A protein has these predicted regions:
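Membrane-aqueous junction of the first/signal-anchor transmembrane helix
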Residues: 1-172
Length: 172
């Protein structure tokens, strides 16, 4: 009978262990360099003591990674593939939100607000300029672009999507 050469087996196990350790080290190094943003967007009410309440479309993101970044652009899309329509939201720093560009370090939050105006004229203009349909509302996405080359995609909350659907229904 042939005997098993256990010395060769130990060499193979140590080689596989070394390869696994190198893979884990590369994964950890790569994840530390990645910028991660968490956020949401939707309809908000701003209520102040000395001023009337104001309705806004709000985009808020928080940097949850250790690497600092700068938010360079906020845009949106409607539709899919070749029927996709793109738009850019412009924000200037004012009393209700930050401007763009906005640097975000670890744990810092950025907040951008677009006033909806009287009778929600911002939503009315959005529906008219982009010829938004019910299908477009389902595919509406907000894209937050950073200086590190990353893009975070947010789905608008139900409250603002419902407002769009009401304006679409009233337009017909």
């Amino acid at each position: 009978m042939a005997e098993i050469a256990w010395g060769s087996f130990a060499d193979w196990v140590s080689g596989i262990g070394s390869l696994a350790a190198a893979g884990v080290a590369l994964y950890v190094a790569n994840s530390a360099q990645r910028v991660k943003l968490k956020g949401y967007c939707g309809h908000r009410l701003i209520i102040g003591l000395a001023q009337p309440q104001e309705e806004v479309f709000s985009v808020q993101v928080t940097n949850v990674s250790q690497r600092p970044t700068v938010v360079t652009n906020i845009g949106f899309t409607f539709g899919l593939w070749r029927w996709k329509r793109h738009g850019i939201l412009t924000f200037v720093q004012d009393d209700i939100g930050h401007g763009i560009p906005k640097p975000l370090s670890d744990g810092e939050t950025g907040n951008w607000n677009a006033r909806l105006g009287s009778d929600n004229c911002w939503i009315t203009n959005l529906v008219a300029q982009f010829s938004i349909t019910r299908f477009s509302v389902l595919t509406w996405r907000i894209h937050v672009h950073t200086s590190n080359g990353g893009t975070t995609t947010l789905r608008p909350e139900k409250n603002i999507r419902d407002m769009l659907l009401v304006h679409i229904a009233s337009r017909k």
